[in-house]
């Protein structure tokens, strides 16, 4: 990126105001949506072009929506991606609605990454994590012989960094992701590591 483009992006991040205008009456919390962020950022673009795209990614036997936000001046560009997993069953929603809701969540968080918005402690973040990682109670506790979640994540990250066989990478990912059941932060980071490595392998293919 040129210094001028970097300065424009930094200026947007500094002045962007995206208040939490949405309210979840069931959970009784406020949150910001993808649309709230877009409404706040559009007046600040001033000639820059912002686009968001979705991609359905199959990891193991589950589908994820990968959203990528890109801002460009025509010569320089900067992108950020985020992924969210589709629920197998979502009460009161058909398949299209599930995909749409998952897309909105992924889009919100790729915009967060692009513009430096921290929603890590938002209630809707925790709610989505709980929906994604729901498992029987007996599976949420590690047995005494199970490795610590930090060790599992570290080992997977080191393995993923050097593995070039996509099939083996997916098998290892599925195994380690299951080991991290009940540890939301480590599971999320595991997914992020997997997503980054898959993108790297696509680029060299």
From Swiss-Prot:
Alphabetical UniProt keywords: DNA-binding, Early protein
Coiled coil region boundaries: none
Domain of life: Viruses
GO molecular function list: DNA binding
Compositional bias annotation for Polar residues: 131-145
This protein's record includes keyword Lipoprotein: no
Record region (Disordered): 124-150
Pfam families reported in the protein's UniProt record: ERF
Protein function: Promotes homologous recombination. Essential for P22 growth in a recA, but not a wild-type, host.
Family statement drawn from the similarity comment of this UniProt entry: To phage H-19B erf.
Protein name: Essential recombination function protein
Organism this protein belongs to: Salmonella phage P22
């Amino acid at each position: 990126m040129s210094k001028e483009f970097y300065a424009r992006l930094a200026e947007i991040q500094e002045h962007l105001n995206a208040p939490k205008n949405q309210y979840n009456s069931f959970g009784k919390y406020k949150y910001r949506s993808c649309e709230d962020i877009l409404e706040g950022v559009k007046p600040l673009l001033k000639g820059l072009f912002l686009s968001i795209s979705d991609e359905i990614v199959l990891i193991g036997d589950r589908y994820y929506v990968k959203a990528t936000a890109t801002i460009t001046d025509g010569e320089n560009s900067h992108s950020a991606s985020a992924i969210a997993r589709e629920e197998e069953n979502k009460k009161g929603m058909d398949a299209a609605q599930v995909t749409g809701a998952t897309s909105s969540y992924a889009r919100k968080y790729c915009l967060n990454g692009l513009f430096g918005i921290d929603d890590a402690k938002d209630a809707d973040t925790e709610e989505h994590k709980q929906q994604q990682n729901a498992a029987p109670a007996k599976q949420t506790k590690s047995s005494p012989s199970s490795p610590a979640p930090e060790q599992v994540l570290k080992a997977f990250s080191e393995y993923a960094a050097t593995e070039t066989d996509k099939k083996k990478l997916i098998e290892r990912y599925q195994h380690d992701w299951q080991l991290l059941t009940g540890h939301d932060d480590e599971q999320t980071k595991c997914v992020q590591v997997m997503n980054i490595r898959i993108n790297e392998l696509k680029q060299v293919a």
